[in-house]
Regions:
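Basic, helix-initiating cap at the start of DNA-binding domains
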Residues: 2-65, 69-81, 94-98
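Alpha-helical DNA-contacting segments of helix-turn-helix folds
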Residues: 98-104
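Short helix-capping/turn signature of helix-turn-helix
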Residues: 90, 148-154, 198
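Short hydrophobic/aromatic patch on the recognition helix
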Residues: 80-90
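Amphipathic C-terminal alpha-helical segment
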Residues: 135-139, 172-173, 177, 193-214, ...
Length: 251
């Protein structure tokens, strides 16, 4: 074939250093090295798939039965792995729950970030972010694992740490955008962010514990939209937010 002849001729030409390119191309990686690399790759792939299967099954069972109602035996049986494989990846049931919690939180924050990504107006961004969060609250795994089970299983400190890692930054970004028209100290912006973050956490608890989660979500949206509308009206009319010194009575 002409193509092969061309390649052969090109390969036979000497390189600038004088050594034929064909000779350089003929050098092969030792077979034992290739076997080692391929073996390591297969082991890593198997290890990752085992861990993923454990988290998948644990998420399903924790959501359906709760943390206390789920045993490690059920998880390894569902994932079709041994307990030794589980302990290779996780120190125990709580560590596995934490991995599930992180996944659910990360999925939630990714959904909210996607929803607000292209929204330029800060007020519309706040409402869009709120609605995206309320949509997340309709997910059974989020309500059960993050809102209901998370604080008790992880403990308050770790729970807050995980929440701040995943969703606090979103709230902080939205609040900073909304308050950009006000001449506020950074500490006041941080305070507003904390207050709104607390309000969203409380809203999550209210919705997750409601019999009619759709109705509860609509009520939360109406309440927070009302607060945002007041802030927007004040901003557009040239008003300003009082600082801590403005609220103190004269002695």
């Amino acid at each position: 074939m002409p193509f092969r002849r061309d390649v052969a001729h090109a390969s036979a030409r000497p390189d600038p250093g004088g050594a034929p390119m064909l000779r350089r191309m003929s050098k092969k990686v030792p077979k034992n090295v290739l076997r080692s690399v391929h073996g390591t790759s297969r082991r890593q792939e198997y290890s990752a798939s085992t861990k993923r299967a454990l988290v998948d099954v644990a998420q399903e069972l924790f959501t359906e039965r709760g943390y206390a109602g789920t045993s490690l035996d059920e998880i390894v049986a569902g994932a079709r792995v041994t307990k030794g494989a589980l302990y290779h990846h996780f120190s125990g049931k709580q560590a596995l729950f934490e991995a599930v919690f992180e996944r659910v939180e990360d999925d939630a924050s990714s959904s909210i970030r996607r929803a607000i990504k292209d929204v330029k107006d800060p007020w519309e961004k706040a409402l869009t972010g709120l609605r995206a969060f309320l949509d997340v609250l309709q997910r059974p795994e989020y309500r059960r694992l993050v809102i209901q089970e998370g604080p008790a299983v992880l403990g308050y400190e770790k729970y807050r740490e995980q929440e701040e890692r995943s969703t606090y930054g979103i709230v902080q970004d939205i609040v900073s955008s909304v308050l950009a028209t006000y001449d506020l100290e950074p500490s006041m912006v941080e305070t507003f962010s904390r207050v709104f973050f607390g309000a969203m956490s409380a809203a999550g608890s209210a919705v997750s514990s409601a019999e009619d989660t759709a109705r509860a979500s609509a009520e939360v949206e109406a309440a927070i939209a009302f607060i945002l509308a007041g802030l927007r009206q004040q901003s557009e009319s040239g008003g300003k937010l009082p600082g801590p010194d403005d609220l103190r009575g004269e002695g």
